Amino acid sequence: MNMKKKEKHAIRKKSIGVASVLVGTLIGFGLLSSKEADASENSVTQSDSASNESKSNDSSSVSAAPKTDDTNVSDTKTSSNTNNGETSVAQNPAQQETTQSALTNATTEETPVTGEATTATNQANTPATTQSSNTNAEELVNQTSNETTSNDTNTVSSVNSPQNSTNAENVSTTQDTSTEATPSNNESAPQSTDASNKDVVNQAVNTSAPRMRAFSLSAVAADAPAAGKDITNQLTNVTVGIDSGDTVYPHQAGYVKLNYGFSVPNSAVKGDTFKITVPKELNLNGVTSTAKVPPIMAGDQVLANGVIDSDGNVIYTFTDYVDTKENVTANITMPAYIDPENVTKTGNVTLTTGIGSTTANKTVLVDYEKYGKFYNLSIKGTIDQIDKTNNTYRQTIYVNPSGDNVIAPVLTGNLKPNTDSNALIDQQNTSIKVYKVDNAADLSESYFVNPENFEDVTNSVNITFPNPNQYKVEFNTPDDQITTPYIVVVNGHIDPNSKGDLALRSTLYGYDSRFVWRSMSWDNEVAFNNGSGSGDGIDKPVVPEQPDEPGEIEPIPEDSDSDPGSDSGSDSNSDSGSDSGSDSTSDSGSDSASDSDSASDSDSASDSDSASDSDSASDSDSASDSDSASDSDSASDSDSASDSDSDNDSDSDSDSDSDSDSDSDSDSDSDSDSDSDSDSDSDSDSDSDSDSDSDSDSDSDSDSDSDSDSDSDSDSDSDSDSDSDSDSDSNSDSDSDSDSDSDSDSDSDSDSDSDSDSDSDSDSDSASDSDSDSDSDSDSDSDSDSDSDSDSDSDSDSDSDSDSDSESDSDSESDSDSDSDSDSDSDSDSDSASDSDSGSDSDSSSDSDSESDSNSDSESGSNNNVVPPNSPKNGTNASNKNEAKDSKEPLPDTGSEDEANTSLIWGLLASIGSLLLFRRKKENKDKK
């Protein structure tokens, strides 16, 4: 029994094993047959697709597509996304990505489902089902062709028209339920959708036929840019133009307009591209950090989007707008800006741009304009970069681009006054770099700066932020001055909440060569053009109001209007106390260099009208020591005109001690024309005391030509008291030639009072060479009132070496009215040595009119002792001279008077004279 159980167990075990083997075998054959069916379906689909392409090339089917195709397609796309979701749930994760893209392509062949089915399937979507495969999308785009466009059109037409039997046959080859499905059958629609989806999945795994219309617009935007064909050379009716003036000012927001027009071939599809060649001398961003090109718009639809490649050219990519349109035309206008890196200097530039083989060119003058300069201060700046995404800007400033010498230079930067500038200037938002430029020629006029080419001296300068929205840069050079240019680069921030534009002012301060504190400013602004988001700076130099105090820095400089031609500078060292009133009109042309240190105390009132033109060259070395005391009261009225030509050579050494008291009134009228050439060497020692009172009226006219060579040694001591009144009218014509050698000893004492009125006209031409030694010490107190009208033209050349020691004490009061016209040219060379001690008190009044013409040639030698002044001038002395010349014998004895009375009288007179003489000398000494 147990054995039966065992047997039954064995038999059941065996039967179960046989059944398992049979079931497994059947399943294996089923799987194999399924794979064969898949391969068959694929091959059928490909052949059918080929037939579809050949059939869909009919142009009538293309034009038959109504505008409602887009609506139907979007419905199909919605269904496609739903199907993707359902299918992907049943698929392996490894196949999900490929399946989604394949289904998207295949759904164009489906029949539209009903609204009920669509709603139901949309609710079944998951996040994973909405994703598209970038890889499959790119593959499909790469396989796009003109045939595909026609095929898509046919496909869209078939969606709207279910009478297209070709697609139905393709589906029925593998699935009958797909063919039987109709839009009106609401119940069978979901089944049809499921069945067709399964078949489409099997087809799409290996299907490569592109179906671009299956992409939604949002999907294209999310994917990488489509890689279509370059149809640049297929564009027709291409026009290219460059719109600009003959001169472009980049730093005045100047730019160039590039204009293009063309027609798009009907064969163009979404993803196709064309290229616009932009010259390297231009860029499309201006000062913005990123360049953008305008999209080509067709109403409110985008026809093509553009990007800039690495070479600066523009690549436009067509959207699906061209898939549904024919005879598409387009026009483009782009603002372009001079590229500062490729065009660094002012000059002519030829610009060439085009589309394909159609080009246009134009030669323009690029003018960067010069920096602003005011005296020795020069500055210019530009805003060369703006980033509105990060709210930053960069400003480049050239400091002292002229390379002048600026003492104690200081640069400040702040917001431009009277503007709503959006810049933020403070230590947290502003970074400053300073570079030194060794040679001004290394600066580019475009303000393109490569920092590697210059020395970074940021750590050597002093950068502070002394006031809100202001920075300050002090150039701490060893000698506190700069002679080379500097580049200051400011990286700042923009206030994103501000509605204003970027507007900055840079100001350079410093001393000029005359140590006058000056300033020069430069303003920068930004302009935007045609919605491109790009632009450049508006630059203009500004001469601000000059600082009042040296070293003063305006916290926030205001707008100012100053006169750039103003220049003031003074350098003086003086100590003076004066009380003067003057009314003068002068016209002078002089070239002088003087260094003076003076202390004066004067009280003068003068009214003068003078016009002088002088050219003088003097070389003098003088040392004077003089001791003089004078008390004079004179009133003179003179009118003189002189014309003299003299040549003097003198060498004098004088030591004089004089005490004079004179009261003179003179009126003289003289006309003299003299030409003299004298060479004299004299040594005189005189002590004279004279008291004379003379009144003379003389009218003389003399013309003399004399040549004299004299050597005299005189020692005279005279005491004279004379009162004379003379009225003489003489006319003399003399021709003399004299050679005299005289030795005289005279002692004279004179007291004179003279009144003279002279009118003279002189014209002199003199050249003098004098060597004098004088030592003078003078103390003068003068009160003068003079009214003079003089016109002088003098040309003098003098070389003097004098050493004088003088001491004088004078008290004078004079009233003079003179009118003189003199033209003098003198050349003198004198060498004299004199030692004189004189005391004179004179009061004279003379009126003389004389005319003399003398020519003398004499040679004389005399040794005489001067007799008292009362002796006649033409008496014995004259005969003695002649006789001494002819004979050296002593004078004959004329005898003597023995009368005692005569001797006594002369003795008394001599005693009285001596007493008077010594008394006068004593009085003179007391006065001193």
Swiss-Prot record:
Keywords annotated in UniProt: Cell wall, Peptidoglycan-anchor, Secreted, Signal, Virulence
GO cellular component: extracellular region
Superkingdom field: Bacteria
Ranges annotated as biased composition (Acidic residues): 546-564, 598-856
Region Ligand binding A region, residue ranges: 40-542
Motif LPXTG sorting signal in this chain: 891-895
Positions bearing Pentaglycyl murein peptidoglycan amidated threonine: T894
Keyword set includes Zinc-finger: no
Biased composition regions of type Polar residues, renumbered to the chain: 71-111, 162-199
Gene3D superfamilies to which the protein is assigned, alphabetical: 2.60.40.1280, 2.60.40.1290
Leader sequence residues: 1-39
Ranges spanned by the short sequence motif YSIRK-G/S signaling motif, renumbered to the chain: 9-20
Region named Disordered: 34-199, 528-899
Propeptide: 895-928
SUPFAM superfamilies per UniProt: Bacterial adhesins
Subcellular location(s) of the protein: Secreted, Cell wall
Membrane topology classification: Peptidoglycan-anchor
Residue ranges with Basic and acidic residues bias: 882-891
One of the protein's GO biological processes: cell adhesion
Main location: secreted
Segments of skewed composition (Low complexity): 47-65, 117-131, 142-161, 565-597, 857-875
Main function: Cell surface-associated protein implicated in virulence. Promotes bacterial attachment exclusively to the gamma-chain of human fibrinogen. Induces formation of bacterial clumps.
Family assignment from sequence similarity: Belongs to the serine-aspartate repeat-containing protein (SDr) family.
Database matches in NCBIfam families: LPXTG_anchor (TIGR01167), MSCRAMM_ClfA (NF033609), YSIRK_signal (TIGR01168)
Identification of the protein by name: Clumping factor A
Higher taxonomy: Bacteria, Bacillati, Bacillota, Bacilli, Bacillales
Protein encoded by which gene: clfA
